Every structure is written in structure tokens, then in C-alpha cells.
Amino acid sequence: MIPGEYHVKPGQIALNTGRATCRVVVENHGDRPIQVGSHYHFAEVNPALKFDRQQAAGYRLNIPAGTAVRFEPGQKREVELVAFAGHRAVFGFRGEVMGPLEVNDE
């Protein structure tokens, strides 16, 4: 095996089947590229990214684990988000939630 190599079965792999999703339009108003990882609580990303943060609360990018999306300065694009699952508790990031999402979902 080569470090970083994947051994997967042939065919398509379905990600996040059955989970709630939403789409948001995001625009980078900053002067530098901003990269957002697959499991970052999207409502807490860099403030230079402008979008409906309330809609994004409790969601992350709907992309494969360990990958990221890069937003270049001035770039505007639509992304798909997927709801956090499991215990639905968020800690860290920018410290805006620090606990169960349902308490903050009002």
C-alpha cells in the first residue's frame, strides 16, 4: 500500500444519504482566498464570506471527508450544505455555539 492510497469498490459511493441539505450562495468579500474544510460548521466560517448564516446554522459542506472548498477573492458560488448528524453538538470553530445545536436553532 502506498501512503494516502485508497482501496474502494467500483461504482458510485453515496454520501450523506437521507440527511437534510440546503444550498447557499457564498461570496468572498476578502482580499485573500478562503478555504473551508468538509466538517467545519459553515455558519462560523470566516466573516469575509458573505451568505445567509442563519440558514447555514447546523450545517457543513456536503463534500467528502478530508476535502475542502476554496473561495477566491471576489468569487461568488452556490454550495450544498448537509446537516450535522450524531449528537449534533458543535465545539470550537469560532466559539459561537459551544454545545448542542438544538439550543441554538431557535
Swiss-Prot record:
GO terms for molecular function: urease activity. Its main location: cytoplasm. It is found in: Cytoplasm. It catalyses: urea + 2 H2O + H(+) = hydrogencarbonate + 2 NH4(+). The keyword Hydrolase applies. Optimum pH is 7.75. Belongs to the urease beta subunit family. Heterotrimer of UreA (gamma), UreB (beta) and UreC (alpha) subunits. Three heterotrimers associate to form the active enzyme. The apoenzyme interacts with an accessory complex composed of UreD, UreF and UreG, which is required for the assembly of the nickel containing metallocenter of UreC. The UreE protein may also play a direct role as a metallochaperone in nickel transfer to the urease apoprotein. This is Urease subunit beta. It comes from Klebsiella aerogenes.
